[in-house]
């Protein structure tokens, strides 16, 4: 899967789940499960409920994603 296949969307974190998983509500209204990308994990970026985030989705599974950015 190339970088051009990835779908980027904005959303809001609703809930922090175990194992660094988060429930995120996208701007379209859909709710997905998302995990933190490696760069956010390495730099100890804290993500809390209510944070605005950018999520990458695979076209193969639109119910799971990867959090790549937390808005300031």
Curated annotation (Swiss-Prot):
Recorded GO CC terms: cytosol
Family stated for the protein in its record: Belongs to the IF-1 family.
Name used for this protein in its record: Translation initiation factor IF-1
Originating organism: Clostridium perfringens (strain 13 / Type A)
InterPro entries hit by this protein: NA-bd_OB-fold (IPR012340), RNA-binding_domain_S1_IF1 (IPR006196), S1_domain (IPR003029), TIF_IF1 (IPR004368)
Assembly and interaction partners: Component of the 30S ribosomal translation pre-initiation complex which assembles on the 30S ribosome in the order IF-2 and IF-3, IF-1 and N-formylmethionyl-tRNA(fMet); mRNA recruitment can occur at any time during PIC assembly.
Annotated CDD domains: S1_IF1
Location of this chain's protein in the cell: Cytoplasm
